[in-house]
Amino acid sequence: MANDNGIKHFIDLSTVPATELRAILEDAKARKARLKAGEVERPYAGKVLAMIFEKPSTRTRVSFDVGMRQLGGETIMLTGSEMQLGRSEAIADTAKVLSRYVDAIMIRTTAHERMLELAEYATVPVINALTDDTHPCQIMADVLTYEEHRGPIKGKTFAWMGDGNNVLHSLVEAAARFDFNVNIATPKGSEPKSQYIDWARANGAGIMSTTDPEKAASGADCIVTDTWVSMGQEDHARGHNVFIPYQVNANLMAKADPKALFMHCLPAHRGEEVTDEVIDGPQSVVFDEAENRLHAQKAILAWCLQDRGLGA
């Protein structure tokens, strides 16, 4: 998404055209290949990425930090307690000030609206590294991972098990952008937000919703799940018992296509949403997903910065 000043923000998969998302994905593949071949790329030497963390993280922090360093740049981390974003200082003012210091801003926060307001007033690119509503960087890594293992994602079917959370919202947006299908199995009361499903369907995604996990898994090319309780939402969580039928185990995987992959954004609660047998099994690609956060996010950073004349 570009604002009125022509700044490219990576807000959601719905805000970036399909052609540009495909270009980012192919760039991620190329950058990964060059890194594995030992090539050193430093197009953003001297550039700085501000990383705002109002929700803690391992994968997001390390992958963005390492990614920016591999591109030749530097990072500075700002925690929620340090920032007091929107409390001691207006978000608009923070956005304007940071834009005078750094070349891009990454934010991992709670309310989606806080990230949107930051992007509205920033004069440098803003990257959504996670909100309570969406997780677009993770899904770019997931699409990259699927295509590495199984080829083009077009026409394939992903099956989601469990809570209708932020990762699922970005997954259905990806289904519209990359032309694949999503079967959603959630217990009643844990469905995804309707605006994400409605947008995905209106933009060509095949979305099926059910309370039956076996129906959703039937013939699927990939089974995806996440924790039953999202970070920071423990006080509002439903009892685990309602999710037990949605555990990804060997019996559920057997309903999918024999070549189906298993994905999880991690961290996983082993023995809850997924069994050890599945997450450690031959169909699991969870650690490839984790690695691919690095490569996908490097390509996202490059996409955000290229049009500003900052490297390639």
UniProtKB/Swiss-Prot annotation:
EC identifiers of the protein: 2.1.3.3
GO biological process terms, semicolon-separated: arginine biosynthetic process via ornithine; citrulline biosynthetic process; L-arginine biosynthetic process
Residues that bind carbamoyl phosphate: 57-60, 84, 108, 135-138, 265-266, 293
Keyword flag Phosphoprotein: no
Any Pfam family hit: OTCace_N
Catalytic activity: carbamoyl phosphate + L-ornithine = L-citrulline + phosphate + H(+)
Pathway(s) it belongs to: Amino-acid biosynthesis; L-arginine biosynthesis; L-arginine from L-ornithine and carbamoyl phosphate: step 1/3
Entry GO terms, CC: cytoplasm
Residue positions binding L-ornithine: 166, 226, 230-231
Transmembrane regions listed in the UniProt entry: none
The entry's keywords: Amino-acid biosynthesis, Arginine biosynthesis, Cytoplasm, Transferase
Source superkingdom: Bacteria
Localization, UniProt: Cytoplasm
GO molecular function (one): ornithine carbamoyltransferase activity
Main location: cytoplasm
Function of the molecule: Reversibly catalyzes the transfer of the carbamoyl group from carbamoyl phosphate (CP) to the N(epsilon) atom of ornithine (ORN) to produce L-citrulline.
Family: Belongs to the aspartate/ornithine carbamoyltransferase superfamily. OTCase family.
HAMAP family per UniProt: OTCase (MF_01109)
Official protein name in the record: Ornithine carbamoyltransferase
The organism of origin for this protein: Brucella suis biovar 1 (strain 1330)
